[in-house]
Amino acid sequence: MTSSRLWFSLLLAAAFAGRATALWPWPQNFQTSDQRYVLYPNNFQFQYDVSSAAQPGCSVLDEAFQRYRDLLFGSGSWPRPYLTGKRHTLEKNVLVVSVVTPGCNQLPTLESVENYTLTINDDQCLLLSETVWGALRGLETFSQLVWKSAEGTFFINKTEIEDFPRFPHRGLLLDTSRHYLPLSSILDTLDVMAYNKLNVFHWHLVDDPSFPYESFTFPELMRKGSYNPVTHIYTAQDVKEVIEYARLRGIRVLAEFDTPGHTLSWGPGIPGLLTPCYSGSEPSGTFGPVNPSLNNTYEFMSTFFLEVSSVFPDFYLHLGGDEVDFTCWKSNPEIQDFMRKKGFGEDFKQLESFYIQTLLDIVSSYGKGYVVWQEVFDNKVKIQPDTIIQVWREDIPVNYMKELELVTKAGFRALLSAPWYLNRISYGPDWKDFYIVEPLAFEGTPEQKALVIGGEACMWGEYVDNTNLVPRLWPRAGAVAERLWSNKLTSDLTFAYERLSHFRCELLRRGVQAQPLNVGFCEQEFEQT
């Protein structure tokens, strides 16, 4: 798509300001007009095309049809609108959906195709996609195109959209260790992710404060590592529900079990797993990272990750590897002896590398791929060529753009998170800081830039729990969502502000308590109940 065509579509959208063009994220190709069609809520239908590979019984689309019908019109009945003058009615009051390839019972993957086209004119109202995942994205766009007049009539404008994501991995991280998030909060977050066309839920499940995951192989991990083994855990059924709920919205679940650091919550449940710290020649009574010198450590990891590999069906697991503090390892005489025998000298990065390489081999043997934090790359751990490196540090050891350059120059795929830590808040419209980030603004060849597969907004939990999660996430995470979905040239802040403000109001209408971007109001505030 040429830049002139993009800017023409932006100008056209500005000319028809309002619900008909307040789309978020912005499509790749968009044409519209002021010609509009009436929708009648009482008998509006989503319908499979006769030639569609997906037909009634397709769980992904059957449930999406009901979900979006409720979002558009609610579950009640509507009086037939009183219309004056000539009005066009949407063809048969139906959106026809056609999917080229089957896949209703599958899981989304990194390679899933999410392209779709949406045509609304005098002759047809058609959503065409290669896959059910593209159809989901198109249904979200359709839902945002429908608008209601002050008199209560539903309209949709004549529209032609051709759309696809810029990056295949568009994620959101939730930290459920530092503060436990109820299952309902996670499911609600998945809903809003789908509204924003985000497609990866990065589930950070282990950290020092708590471990809420219920392991059936090592139940003591949860019993002794969670805040409360009854109320603050995720059961096997909870995990299954999250995975299926996400699947029905075209969202992958990327589970993170971070080691060897960030694992103090595992210590009580698995005696001997963590490294005893020493003060001089005596144990201090405190513990550090996982002990990499013991065979028992790797036996535990083999068994635990065999379980995890079966519970979480996505091809990838996130294995962490960040912020390993060597202080405790340095103090421990058994660790020192192990390093001498291995020929590591006093280079604790070699010890870390030994542990992580062994863990990666274990996970690979289960047919899994893996994502790691950037320290694994920075510390020169020997990793497989298909490893995905997540860049999270803004300027240590180098600026994050330089880090992307180095990671991709080495031939690894990369994810960007460094500028998108949503748990960090400031006064004013900080969404703009997230929005203006250009993920490919580093020096590198086209081949290097093709290795950046997307990014993630991160919501770490030190100061975030169920009471403030939603307004801190939304609509700020939407700025990241558009940056990862839309064309690079969709970058005008004024245009973004108008649409994001409207989208925030739409989120409120859908029951999401998204915070305001600035002074103003939402039109639904004036409606009398």
From Swiss-Prot:
GO terms for biological process: adult walking behavior; carbohydrate metabolic process; cell morphogenesis involved in neuron differentiation; dermatan sulfate proteoglycan catabolic process; ganglioside catabolic process; glycosaminoglycan biosynthetic process; glycosaminoglycan metabolic process; hyaluronan catabolic process. Addition of GM2A stimulates the hydrolysis of sulfated glycosphingolipid SM2 and the ganglioside GM2. Changing L127R: In GM2G1; infantile. It is an enzyme of class 3 (hydrolase). GO terms for cellular component: azurophil granule; beta-N-acetylhexosaminidase complex; cytosol; extracellular exosome; intracellular membrane-bounded organelle; lysosomal lumen; lysosome; membrane. InterPro entries: Beta_hexosaminidase_sua/sub, Glyco_hydro_20_cat, Glycoside_hydrolase_SF, Hex-like_dom2, HEX_eukaryotic_N. Belongs to the glycosyl hydrolase 20 family. This is Beta-hexosaminidase subunit alpha. It comes from Homo sapiens (Human).
